[in-house]
Swiss-Prot record:
Keywords: Coiled coil, Membrane, Transmembrane, Transmembrane helix. The keyword Magnesium does not apply. This is UPF0496 protein 1. It comes from Oryza sativa subsp. indica (Rice). The chain crosses the membrane at residues 234-254, 257-277. The lineage of its organism: Eukaryota, Viridiplantae, Streptophyta, Embryophyta, Tracheophyta.
Length: 388
């Protein structure tokens, strides 16, 4: 009994079972199945797998002789070590290719700065437009005064009856004075204003193009997110191959405890690296999502600003045409007395439309300004909300 106990106390500890060192059979089979499917759908992973199989086969073939004689040559160990180092280097290369600090992108923040600068220029343009609208409303006031003067002078028609031969400037002098002031005021939209409009419009178009290009690149990155799954698959395959090779090494030197230790050590990365990859993947996805949210917000804001500017340009053209038409009426009214009456009647017909166009333009200018400020706020919220 004692001898039995004594001999048992010096018996080497039982090697850890392969089940405790390796993932469960079902889990391993599922992982292998997933890896095989990934290889079929991913050319790069398929290339890596081919290289991995070739290196693993070469290492095992080198070890085969050592297994037969239960010993290993230095050359065999060098081959195995080189194979494992090659596989690890391949994993590092893939990870380094994929791991980039996406959110802290100088290009993105340059784009954000450009966006805020262009939006400020557009707001400045809206301020310039307000000044033009004030001049247009002043022109409206001149026309209202001219019509009032005409009514007053019509009321005094009896007093002027004895002056039928008088020049129209004598009978409708005050009316013509106001009409000439309107004519002298001319187009409220100056050449400088149109130059500013063109500059702002081109800037917004350029901004939209930059944002579209950036979004296209981000979309490609999102589609390429399967690279992270490739990393996970590569780590799994490399670990699997390492376990296989280490098992052959252990068999070759006839050391079961070493085999167990190597198997356990090689299997550890399957769980820990998997969690790390998941964490890395989540950070990558969050960073891409944050960039896309910011770029999309800027893209929507820029698109709306361009549409607002298009509407403003259409309304400006309409106001200019109506002013030009009424100036023609004023020039016609300057001919004679009857021309004054006809010109004033035409102006009365056109004035209401002119007033409505100026009002519409003012509302569109306010809308453009509100849209830009709202878009700027949304972009800032997207940036603040995203974790740095």
């Amino acid at each position: 009994m004692g001898n039995s106990s004594s001999s048992g106390s010096h018996r080497p500890p039982r090697p850890a079972s392969s089940e405790s060192a390796l993932p469960p059979a079902a889990a391993a089979a599922e992982e292998l199945s997933s890896y095989e499917a990934a290889c079929r759908s991913d050319p790069e992973l398929r290339t890596f797998d081919t290289t991995l199989q070739r290196r693993t086969s070469r290492a095992i073939s080198t070890l085969a002789v050592g297994v037969e004689v239960r010993s290993l040559s230095l050359e065999s160990l060098r081959e195995v070590t080189g194979c494992l180092l090659d596989m690890n280097q391949e994993v590092v290369r893939v990870i380094l290719d994929c791991k980039k600090d996406i959110w802290k992108s100088p290009e993105l923040f340059d784009l954000v700065e450009d966006y805020f600068e262009s939006s400020l220029h557009t707001l400045d343009f809206c301020t310039a437009l307000d000044k033009c609208l004030k001049r247009a409303r002043d022109s409206q006031l001149l026309l209202h005064v001219a019509l009032q003067r005409f009514d007053d002078e019509e009321d005094n028609d009896a007093a002027a009856a004895g002056q039928e031969d008088a020049a129209p400037s004598a009978r409708y002098a005050r009316t013509l004075h106001e009409l000439r002031q309107f004519k002298a005021a001319g187009d409220p939209f100056t050449e400088e204003f149109f130059s500013a409009f063109q500059a702002v419009y081109r800037q917004q178009l350029t901004m939209l193009e930059k944002l579209q290009q950036r979004k296209h690149r981000l979309d490609k990155k999102v589609r390429a997110i399967k690279a992270w799954r490739r990393v996970s698959s590569i780590i799994f395959a490399t670990t699997f191959a390492a376990v296989l090779i280490c098992s052959v090494v252990a068999a070759a030197i006839a050391a079961p405890p070493v085999a167990a230790a190597l198997a356990a050590a090689a299997s550890i990365p399957v769980g820990s690296m998997g969690k790390w990859i998941d964490s890395l993947l989540k950070g990558y996805q969050d960073a891409l999502r944050g960039q896309k949210e910011v770029v999309s917000a800027m893209q929507v804001g820029t698109f709306i600003a361009i549409k607002d500017l298009d509407s403003i340009r259409v309304l400006i053209n309409r106001v200019e045409l109506e002013i030009s038409s009424m100036i023609d009426c004023v020039e016609f009214a300057e001919r004679d007395e009857e021309a004054v009456k006809f010109g004033v009647e035409e102006i009365k017909k056109k004035l209401e439309v002119f007033m409505k166009s100026v009002e519409d333009l003012g509302e569109q200018a306010d809308r453009c300004s509100r849209d830009i400020r709202r878009a700027r706020t949304v972009v800032l919220q997207r940036i603040i909300r995203h974790p740095s």
